[in-house]
Amino acid sequence: MPFSLGQRWISDTESELGLGTVVAVEGRMVTVMFPATDENRMFSRADAPLTRVIFNPGDKAESHEGWSLTVSEVEEKDNLIIYHGIHDETGEQVSLRETLLNHNIRFNKPQDRLFAGQIDRLERFGIRYQCQQLRHKLATSDMLGLQGPRVGLIPHQQWIAHEVGRRFAPRVLLADEVGLGKTIEAGLIIHQQLLTGRAERILVIVPDTLRHQWLVEMLRRFNLKFSVFDEDRCVEAYADSDNPFYTEQLVICSLELLRKKRRLDQALAADWDLMVVDEAHHLEWTEDAPSRAYRIVEALSEEIPGVLLLTATPDQLGHQSHFARLRLLDPDRFYDYEAFLKEETNYADIASTADALAGNEPLSQEIIDNLKTQLAEKDITAATDIIQATDADVDQQQAARDALLQDLLDRHGTGRVLYRNSRASVKGFPTRIFNQYPQKMPAQYVTAARVGAMMNGHLDTAGKVKQALSPEKIYQEFESSSASWWKFDPRVDWLIDFLKENRREKVLIIASQAETALSLEEALRTREGIQATVFHEGMSIIERDKAGAYFAQETGGAQALICSEIGSEGRNFQFASQLILFDLPLNPDLLEQRIGRLDRIGQNNDVSIHVPYLEDTAQESLMQWYHKGLNAFEQTCPSGHILFNEFSESLLNVLISQDKEVLEQVLSDTQTRYAELKSVMEQGRDKLLEINSHGGERANKLVNALAERDEDTNLIGSVIRLWDIIGVEQEDSGENAIVLRPSEHMMFPTYPGLPEDGITVTFDREMALSRDDIALITQEHPLVQTGLDLITSSETGTTSVAVLKNKSLPAGTIFLELIYMADASAPKSSQLYRYLPPTPVRVLLDKNGNNLADNVNYESFNKQLSAVNRHIASKLVNASQAVLHPLFAKGEEFASSELTLLTESSRAKMTTQLNGELERLEALKAVNPNIRDEELAHLREQMVELNGYLDGAVLQLDAIRLVLVSHA
């Protein structure tokens, strides 16, 4: 497309942005500014979804200053349009450059199409109205952003996302224990912030090894297309922008990239709304010497309004490091470590009070006295009397307990910035059952190990241990490439026997190396014909998806999935409960990550862990250290990496020497230290914080409401009908799944987000959770949103003519059905949609101009109508013109009255909600310094802004249906 600075264009997919102006044309990209909504968009010049706005003679063109002219001549000069015509108020001859056009101009004129004979099919009018209703329903949902992600409805995860995701610029530390889903919580918050417009530009900083995992998680679970940035991508992006970070809205990068000063400076200047930092417990800090990584994140946190830090159990690197992370979130609040420690001493009393309230026993006098002190500004007598009464209603007692508990939570020192759930406080985890299978060391391995010791004497301790743990690699190294260790390794024999004995079980097998995984698949296939598939880092995302889907299939699927260490990162297989660790990693965190593929929230069965090992080898010694020293197979071990760091030298030495006495001493010392650390961590548990983090009964109510929406059959019917109308090919693939493909007969040339080779979808959350290759369709899914946008941003269904066969009415009786959209242009970040989203207003007029909409239900009326062909419809319209013209003016009067009611209702709702939240936070600020001044200021500014936007609410005629009564 030919673009020039100053030209006016509209977005085909986001018409609500108003009239845009080309502000930059660089390389392959064009940037368009939309002043009405204060938005910028960058498009590819080759296929930008934009339409040039050019008025014709006879049209009215409005200036941004408010005056308008009737166009008599259109002049093009230097690729820009100049309109000449008569000023509508003064009658003078005037000119208007296109750059000075009103930014809020709307362009749909259904009545022009109706009188021009451009009449749509009857069902298209219905689908358009339905689409507008669906968009309105989603925009007004109090759970917007929570239903769409392909995640289980886990109460504590949904609660944290609900609480944090609706804040302006949240600054929060997510510190759940392993397996509780911190990444999912972060993804839910990101998804909610994006859908609600609170954030648009997001930077995710993760370790190098987790970049791919985050990319996959965000795409597969949240339908968010992040871009991974490394040095090569930054260099490539220079063709489009001086700052590479401006070329994408959603970016994942590593800390390593930001260690380069130039890249850090560019990231600091990139106007992010939200930053997410994974593995934040690795940010080392001391008051005198903060690490380079810490200083990088600190610099970014000073520029970026919203910050999410994801960390393991907060105190596992020491309490000072925990304070340092809180300091990143709010340096004014957490300014001094000693002051923080002093403040924390007060939390113990609050926690014991909370424990008592959370229970069912009557409160002791000591607890009541504590409550009166802790909630000194409130009169709690009535609440405590209800709790203590022996004849009080149980629900009333629970409500009184909950109210007092909420008051305590609001006053808790870190309750708004720190969320931490532990397995002790969250139900739903399976039991781990550990099984060990000793095997004799094959003679071939003994010989290979002896030769290896002579040949590789130069290796350091870590290298020797690696060899000792993988004798099959040494054997393969010294034998010919055709030699196959799996033909004599007793662990393989045991594996085959196990799979044959458990043919009905899905079995996940994990090995350290991709080569080992491939060899095992070959062994199972060639020796016994066992159906297995592999999953390793050398495969593409699509190949891994297919392997995972083959494993997940209940009928005809693979019995076993064999994963390498890296290949299994970020993938969970809760539908399986049998885990075989063919070898063991030399890292407790990796062991926990392996077990965590199955042992997660949502696992319905006990998890059986099977470890075949070679007797009297490093494999057995390492297995004993994990089992007897850390109890790592049967329990999670948050202190695992601390213990490994403390004992690594003695452990590595004993793995090589195989000295039994030394091993026993290492095991004994590890057990003692493990018990010490476990005790310290248990004492450090903050019960009040856990209550706040998992949400209790409020979280359960939220999840139940989401589950009810999953069962909405009306939505399923509406979406399938939408795809039918658009022309998407739909094929039932069984198991509650549908394959969608573009067809040659689609209403639109492209359907963004629908792949050429199709996509498999389901409306069943459980099905989607068990199959990585199946998308979960909800009202929030991009395929649904895009479908709604395709219909509502086009002229589809804006005009229709129908016949009503009803002999109780005179033949030829006319009804005019008008659908208006009440709307106001505002930046998405203003949150106006919460109070006045685009709202369909229906008017149904008889020939005398009476509005029958309140008395005649749309659905029942629609069912009585019959379609007519376009030729006859056009004749009927022409014959009715004299009656129709005055009815349009009458319809606008009724719609305007409805707009006034909508606006005032929206204003009242906004004032009540925001004033209530402001008063609550102002009251809390007196007792909890964690309430940030920025949040209060934002609420005040938001109320002023929203009142202004509501004053600018307008009506737009969206669709017309002419109905004539016939007796034929």
Swiss-Prot record:
Q: What is its EC number?
A: 3.6.4.-
Q: Which residues are noted in the entry as ATP-binding?
A: D176, E177, V178, G179, L180, G181, K182, T183
Keyword vocabulary terms for this entry? Activator, ATP-binding, DNA-binding, Helicase, Hydrolase, Nucleotide-binding, Transcription, Transcription regulation
Against PROSITE patterns, the record matches this protein to: HELICASE_ATP_BIND_1, HELICASE_CTER
> One GO molecular-function annotation for this sequence?
ATP binding
- Record keyword Amino-acid biosynthesis present: no
Instruction: Specify the Helicase C-terminal domain's residue ranges.
Output: 491-645
Give GO terms for biological process: regulation of DNA-templated transcription
State a single Pfam family of this protein.
Tudor_RapA
**Residue ranges constituting the Helicase ATP-binding domain according to the UniProt record:** 163-332
The entry's function note states: Transcription regulator that activates transcription by stimulating RNA polymerase (RNAP) recycling in case of stress conditions such as supercoiled DNA or high salt concentrations. Probably acts by releasing the RNAP, when it is trapped or immobilized on tightly supercoiled DNA. Does not activate transcription on linear DNA. Probably not involved in DNA repair.
Oligomer and partners? Interacts with the RNAP. Has a higher affinity for the core RNAP than for the holoenzyme. Its ATPase activity is stimulated by binding to RNAP.
Q: What is this protein called?
A: RNA polymerase-associated protein RapA
According to its UniProt entry, this protein's organism is Shewanella woodyi (strain ATCC 51908 / MS32)
The gene that this protein is the product of is rapA
